[in-house]
Design a protein with these regions (language model features):
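Selective for proline/serine-rich intrinsically disordered segments
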Residues: 1-2, 8, 45, 111
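Bacterial N-terminal signal peptides that target proteins for export
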Residues: 2-18
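Short aromatic-glycine motifs in intrinsically disordered, low-complexity regions
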Residues: 29-30, 92
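A cross-family detector of function-defining hotspots
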Residues: 32-80, 97-165
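Acidic/histidine-rich, surface-exposed loop or edge segments in extracytoplasmic proteins
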Residues: 81-91
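Short alpha-helical interface patches
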Residues: 90-98
Length: 165
């Protein structure tokens, strides 16, 4: 008979894998352009945030901090879907304008961060986003200066906590 303590680690891994599969199922299925706001809300529920856009409204469906996805559904002035996209991708992150974008711009494009962090070598906030790159858990950091302007970005692996952390 295998001692229970030896089963704990493999069981934890199975639980993490099953949890990841379940969370992947939380991703929005494609939303058709032309769908109404009411149809989007009926199908996906209340968004995590709404942001005014020059030509309409953005419904944000962010799964931060636990998830690795954030969907942006853009509606025109009449309340019809113009576009829907996953925001937390490398191509989207590359659009960030260093020295030009502000905290407001970042949160409009990516939704709320998973965390707001601080490091000794940086004077401002660091917005932390969890995302997937080809099924690899990643972190994306957005470094803001004291005026809330983006000065730098970075990315790295989202490593699981060690057993005793």
């Amino acid at each position: 008979m295998t001692p229970p303590l030896l089963l704990a680690k493999p069981l934890r891994r199975v639980t993490l894998v099953l949890g990841s599969v379940w969370l992947a199922g939380c991703a929005l299925v494609p939303i058709q352009p032309g769908a109404t706001r009411a149809e989007v809300l009926a199908k996906y529920g209340k968004p995590s945030a709404e942001v005014a856009l020059p030509a309409g409204t953005r419904l944000q469906y962010s799964y931060q901090p636990a998830g690795q996805s954030a969907w942006m559904v853009d509606l025109d002035a009449s309340g019809r879907v113009v576009s829907a996209k996953e925001a937390l991708t490398l191509n989207e992150f590359f659009k960030i304008g260093l020295g030009r974008w502000t905290r407001v711009d970042v949160q409009r494009e990516f939704g709320r961060p998973a965390a707001i962090s601080h490091v000794a070598s940086w004077p401002g906030d660091v917005l932390v986003y969890r995302w997937l790159d080809a099924n690899t858990p990643m972190l994306f950091w957005v470094y803001l200066d004291a005026g809330n302007v983006v000065q730098r970005t970075g990315q790295g692996l989202d490593l699981p906590p060690k057993e005793n952390d």
